[in-house]
């Protein structure tokens, strides 16, 4: 129930889906619940939603710490650490609790969906659904079918994401997919400019935001994403 999970949950719950937010850590669940309350209260203050809508959204989400609580889910979206073996283990375990029709999706930003699917008894139900941070605000969502993914699962996933009023880009199951593949030079060339003492961090960020019209500079973005995650993606 970290940043991405909470963000994805906010997308789901505002579309009248019943949402279950899972984490083994009860403290993390409590933190997510408080963050949602803060976000919704701000939306009420700005008159984006009213108190009735706030209550409806809050009632749509439950916080669980046992995988068996996900048993009646139509769609499960995983957003844990970017480690292939950890994800494979989770997906394999999930199959013990969910129905055969449940779609299992990974929010991975770069790992092979086919490799994750290979850990499952029903690999055809596995697909990539890659949101961008912050998920409630970013419109683009990459949908990545593995070689094993069924056409029905792909079609259902595209419809679901579209119903959430997001823009779907279907990507090939290749490292980095679309956006993170394109972003590699954005980071690497910025690092090279710094390494060659052409400009410092702040100047590079300033130039790309002011002249290039990027919302965030490369170093600001790397700090936000986390260098550990960026390294794995690269």
Segments predicted by a language model, with ranges:
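N-terminal glycine-rich phosphate-binding loop for ADP-containing cofactors
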Residues: 1-234
